Amino acid sequence: MRINPTTSGPGVSALEKKNLGHIAQIIGPVLDVVFPPGKMPNIYNALVVKGRDTVSQQINVTCEVQQLLGNNRVRAVAMSATDGLMRGMEVIDTGAPLSVPVGGATLGRIFNVLGEPVDDLGPVDTGTTSPIHRSAPAFIQLDTKLSIFETGIKVVDLLAPYRRGGKIGLFGGAGVGKTVLIMELINNIAKAHGGVSVFGGVGERTREGNDLYMEMKESGVINEENIAESKVALVYGQMNEPPGARMRVGLTALTMAEYFRDVNEQDVLLFIDNIFRFVQAGSEVSALLGRMPSAVGYQPTLSTEMGTLQERITSTKEGSITSIQAVYVPADDLTDPAPATTFAHLDATTVLSRGLAAKGIYPAVDPLDSTSTMLQPQIVGEEHYETAQRVKQTLQRYKELQDIIAILGLDELSEEDRLTVARARKIERFLSQPFFVAEVFTGSPGKYVGLAETIRGFKLILSGELDSLPEQAFYLVGNIDEATAKATNLEMENNLKK
């Protein structure tokens, strides 16, 4: 699908053709604006309020038209704080939706929802902008090739492999490691695949956004000396922003990614942290606009809003967008409408478990709950499929036996079940892995494990060749050779203690 980029500045289109209205009502981030008869702006048009407040501070607020109320009134949602706005202030209809800068000049820079740089590195050197509201690519333009996207993370590559050009969801409650996993994926993909990434920070912590930026500079993903050599563009609309900005920042990031796909014909990675906050912002805006709430207080348009965003994240014959989205699960309830609606759009789901995080097994990916449409023998091959199924069977049997172990103890199990439990505990620990982005916390260097190495390691555990090794030897290591070396070191340490 080709974009027709314009060549005006970012944020708002040229303001020459002035269609002027004035503010009639302000309720928090929502403005009612009156326009002259016959000059009503279209839905999604950007409106700009410029002027000075009561203490002569400059005001420049951009809003987006959401409703036409009748009587020449429109209702718009502000993209920044509405402090200092007053009734009667002049409002300019720009005659077009919000437009943001696109292209190579966006790499290495941080933007807000309007496409304005917020990193104090001066203006963006691009004349090309693109509107954030566009239709999804036509069905005939979509690409249908199936191939695996290797991440270097054992548990993901083996049990819930990602599809190149697919959509992946990271599900988890608060504090189980979604953001760390996303940061590791950005790091691994930038190093191993050398692709261009766009990161959309939607309604998450500003501190984490800052940490991510600093880490990217340290690791070279963002090149400070030569900013054009950078591999990622960052778009932030964090927790402190009004709901309008949080609702639209995902579209800003997606618009930048679409340009790399359609015009530059590149394979792009789009990270969204957190897609739940996109839904949450939509819910806030929906309530402010006076719509009747739906199930659990969510907006009645939940499925439509999610579909509009997700249908644009796709692969065409020009290039691909592989999207990795963190999904916060409220109160760890996967049946909540927000995560449940997201599930429908995904090719793979990586579910993070509080139980595993409590055991200290990181990444805390639940091997039985995580799924992928790619885990089929005709796609991944017989060896990979068989190994993954046997790993899942072993872990499932261990899960079934846990109640018996808790009540009666290990000694009451049959010989076969005891062996299954021992291997399952080794597998559980071998699914952990030291991360590059967590080196500061763990003290151990990060590891990238190729898919072939991962399969070899799990086949060895399942075959029983490593039954004699202690289970702690498999904890936080890379490939299986490191586990055997760690077992030898542990044995030597024990002998020295004796």
From Swiss-Prot:
<keyword id="KW-0813">Transport</keyword>
<keyword id="KW-0406">Ion transport</keyword>
<dbReference type="InterPro" id="IPR020003">
    <property type="entry name" value="ATPase_a/bsu_AS"/>
</dbReference>
<feature type="binding site">
    <location>
        <begin position="172"/>
        <end position="179"/>
    </location>
    <ligand>
        <name>ATP</name>
    </ligand>
</feature>
<dbReference type="InterPro" id="IPR036121">
    <property type="entry name" value="ATPase_F1/V1/A1_a/bsu_N_sf"/>
</dbReference>
<keyword id="KW-0547">Nucleotide-binding</keyword>
<dbReference type="InterPro" id="IPR004100">
    <property type="entry name" value="ATPase_F1/V1/A1_a/bsu_N"/>
</dbReference>
<protein>
    <recommendedName>
        <fullName>ATP synthase subunit beta, chloroplastic</fullName>
        <ecNumber>7.1.2.2</ecNumber>
    </recommendedName>
</protein>
<dbReference type="GO" id="GO:0009535">
    <property type="term" value="C:chloroplast thylakoid membrane"/>
</dbReference>
<dbReference type="GO" id="GO:0005739">
    <property type="term" value="C:mitochondrion"/>
</dbReference>
<dbReference type="GO" id="GO:0016887">
    <property type="term" value="F:ATP hydrolysis activity"/>
</dbReference>
<dbReference type="GO" id="GO:0005524">
    <property type="term" value="F:ATP binding"/>
</dbReference>
<dbReference type="GO" id="GO:0046933">
    <property type="term" value="F:proton-transporting ATP synthase activity, rotational mechanism"/>
</dbReference>
<keyword id="KW-0150">Chloroplast</keyword>
<dbReference type="Pfam" id="PF00006">
    <property type="entry name" value="ATP-synt_ab"/>
</dbReference>
<keyword id="KW-0472">Membrane</keyword>
<dbReference type="GO" id="GO:0042776">
    <property type="term" value="P:proton motive force-driven mitochondrial ATP synthesis"/>
</dbReference>
<dbReference type="GO" id="GO:0045259">
    <property type="term" value="C:proton-transporting ATP synthase complex"/>
</dbReference>
<keyword id="KW-0793">Thylakoid</keyword>
<comment type="function">
    <text>Produces ATP from ADP in the presence of a proton gradient across the membrane. The catalytic sites are hosted primarily by the beta subunits.</text>
</comment>
<keyword id="KW-0375">Hydrogen ion transport</keyword>
<keyword id="KW-1278">Translocase</keyword>
<dbReference type="InterPro" id="IPR003593">
    <property type="entry name" value="AAA+_ATPase"/>
</dbReference>
<dbReference type="InterPro" id="IPR050053">
    <property type="entry name" value="ATPase_alpha/beta_chains"/>
</dbReference>
<dbReference type="InterPro" id="IPR005722">
    <property type="entry name" value="ATP_synth_F1_bsu"/>
</dbReference>
<keyword id="KW-0067">ATP-binding</keyword>
<dbReference type="Pfam" id="PF22919">
    <property type="entry name" value="ATP-synt_VA_C"/>
</dbReference>
<keyword id="KW-0139">CF(1)</keyword>
<comment type="subunit">
    <text>F-type ATPases have 2 components, CF(1) - the catalytic core - and CF(0) - the membrane proton channel. CF(1) has five subunits: alpha(3), beta(3), gamma(1), delta(1), epsilon(1). CF(0) has four main subunits: a(1), b(1), b'(1) and c(9-12).</text>
</comment>
<dbReference type="InterPro" id="IPR024034">
    <property type="entry name" value="ATPase_F1/V1_b/a_C"/>
</dbReference>
<dbReference type="InterPro" id="IPR000194">
    <property type="entry name" value="ATPase_F1/V1/A1_a/bsu_nucl-bd"/>
</dbReference>
<comment type="similarity">
    <text>Belongs to the ATPase alpha/beta chains family.</text>
</comment>
<dbReference type="Pfam" id="PF02874">
    <property type="entry name" value="ATP-synt_ab_N"/>
</dbReference>
<dbReference type="InterPro" id="IPR027417">
    <property type="entry name" value="P-loop_NTPase"/>
</dbReference>
<keyword id="KW-0066">ATP synthesis</keyword>
<dbReference type="InterPro" id="IPR055190">
    <property type="entry name" value="ATP-synt_VA_C"/>
</dbReference>
<keyword id="KW-0934">Plastid</keyword>
